[in-house]
Swiss-Prot record:
Keywords: Ribonucleoprotein, Ribosomal protein, RNA-binding, rRNA-binding. InterPro entries: Ribosomal_bS6, Ribosomal_bS6_sf, Ribosomal_S6_plastid/chlpt, Transl_elong_EF1B/ribsomal_bS6. GO terms for biological process: translation. This is Small ribosomal subunit protein bS6. GO terms for cellular component: cytosolic small ribosomal subunit.
Length: 122
């Protein structure tokens, strides 16, 4: 089995359905003998360019280990899900379990917000 990193972008109106989508994709991988090494919900972020007249979308990153059949099934699910605006699947050499640079940035932003709120409260 090979390791893959999958990033998909979900329509912002469907953001509340993202946890269910993640669970469905995780169950697809695990039911066929694969493993999910990392799941990151990056949240709503600004798009680099407009997609379907949208400026923001919900980003999700998955690091998985699976076979070709499972990957083909996932790709089919992404293509025919109207809520998924774009997806990218990249083969990696090893399993990535550490937080991605994007998650480190999100954590840093949240820490700044928390510090600002405690400063205002004081």
């Amino acid at each position: 089995m090979r390791h893959y990193e999958i990033v998909f972008i979900v329509h912002p109106d469907q953001s509340e359905q993202v946890p269910a989508m993640i669970e469905r994709y995780k169950s697809t991988v695990t039911s066929q003998g694969g493993q999910v090494h990392r799941v990151e919900d990056w949240g709503r972020r600004q798009l680099a360019y407009m997609i379907q007249k949208l400026a923001k979308a919900h980003y999700v990153c998955l690091n998985i280990e699976c076979g070709k059949e499972t990957l083909a099934e996932l790709e089919h699910a992404f293509k025919f899900n109207d809520a998924v605006l774009r997806h990218l699947i990249v083969q990696t050499k090893k399993a990535e379990t550490a937080p991605s640079p994007m998650m480190k940035e999100v954590a840093r932003e949240e820490a700044k917000k928390a510090a600002a709120q405690t400063e205002q409260a004081a």
